[in-house]
From Swiss-Prot:
Species per Swiss-Prot/TrEMBL record: Fragaria ananassa (Strawberry)
Gene name tied to this protein: EO
Sequence positions that bind NADP(+): 59, 174-175, 197-200, 215, 253, 264-266, 311-322
PROSITE patterns: QOR_ZETA_CRYSTAL
Parts of the chain that traverse the membrane: none
Oligomeric and partner information: Monomer.
Record-listed substrate binding positions: K59
Protein name: 2-methylene-furan-3-one reductase
Length: 322
């Protein structure tokens, strides 16, 4: 294996860990001496620069999918941006010194890694990573992988194509902000509508939304028009199926799904990030950070508390690490 010549990789590192399931405020503990993960032949070791939080992180900590989870203790964190410091013998895409980003867990809910991104070092499979776009900061890059890949996979499953209309339920969240941008700039939707609370409607318009809907005042079931695609990012498929055209598609990332809606769980792929690189580098698709970001590594519990409050607009990022 090739290792960074200029940097000796320690055997232990600082990380946040939980050893039992529960609320993040109760179970997350800072540990200054967690073992640095071993790198398999198809993996790289990353010196983490920034990480972002996703709802799956706190749902996992609560034990929502403990039947398929990896054994505790767990260093949480799916999204990572950092620098490669060591490569496995079979790795061909990356070399020591490369700036990379990705969602560490190919299958989000089945044996996710015990060594997540909320640590100084993490190991990642080559196939889930991509080269960081040069124009993006590590903070911006860390905000993207799980959210933008989820947005992309859902739009593909919904067969959105040029000239079709789409309604996004939950347009201001981490995934919703990317559904809107990808629908508009990558998939060529003719009309993008999205829901948010009153004070976030102007924010939706800055993302390119044609019709911003205040869910506190309007029922989507009663809208005068129907849509070719409805993408539910909040868990309201019972309403979503009433807003879709005959023969249209409804996808959701929050189960269970009311038929004919399709529920899916992201398969993390670095190839999707590479495919979207031109749109990110041109600025057509932009990372969306919550105004409170970034949170320092020492304030991780507060960062989770904010994410869990459902108040975030865009992504909650942790930087610098440590």
């Amino acid at each position: 294996m090739a290792a960074a010549p200029s940097e000796s990789i320690p055997s232990v590192n600082k990380a946040w860990v939980y050893s039992e399931y529960g609320k993040t405020s109760d179970v997350l503990k800072f540990d200054p001496s967690v073992a640095v993960p071993e790198v398999k032949e198809d993996q790289v070791l990353i010196k983490v620069v920034a990480a972002s939080l996703n709802p799956v992180d706190f749902k996992r900590a609560l034990g929502y999918f403990k039947d398929t989870d990896s054994p505790l203790p767990t260093v949480p964190g799916y999204d990572v941006a950092g620098v490669v410091v060591k490569v496995g013998s079979q790795v061909t895409k990356f070399k020591v010194g490369d700036e990379v980003y990705g969602d560490l867990n190919e299958a989000a809910l089945v044996n996710p890694t015990r060594f997540g991104s909320l640590a100084e070092y993490t190991a990642a499979d080559e196939r889930v990573l991509a080269h960081k776009p040069k124009d993006l900061s590590f903070i911006e890059a860390a905000s993207l992988p799980l959210a933008i890949e989820t947005a992309y996979e859902g739009l593909e499953r919904a067969e959105l194509s040029a000239g079709k209309s789409i309604l996004v339920l939950g347009g201001a969240g981490g995934v919703g902000t990317h559904i809107i941008q990808l629908a508009k700039h990558v998939f060529g939707a003719s009309k993008v509508a999205a829901t948010a609370s009153t004070k976030k409607l102007d924010f939706l318009r800055t993302l390119g939304v044609d019709l911003a809907i205040d869910y506190t005042k309007e029922n989507i079931e009663d809208l005068p028009e129907k849509f070719d695609v409805v993408y539910d990012a909040v868990g309201e498929t019972d309403k979503a199926v009433k807003a879709v055209k005959e023969g249209g598609k409804v996808v959701t990332i929050v189960g269970p799904a009311t038929p004919p809606a399709i529920h899916f769980v992201l398969t993390s792929k670095g190839s999707v990030l590479e495919k979207l690189k031109p749109y990110l580098e041109s600025g057509k698709v932009k990372p969306v950070l919550d105004p409170t970001s970034p949170y320092p590594f020492t304030k991780l519990v507060e960062a989770f508390g904010y994410l869990e409050s459902s108040r975030a607009t865009g992504k909650v990022v942790v930087y610098p690490i440590p």
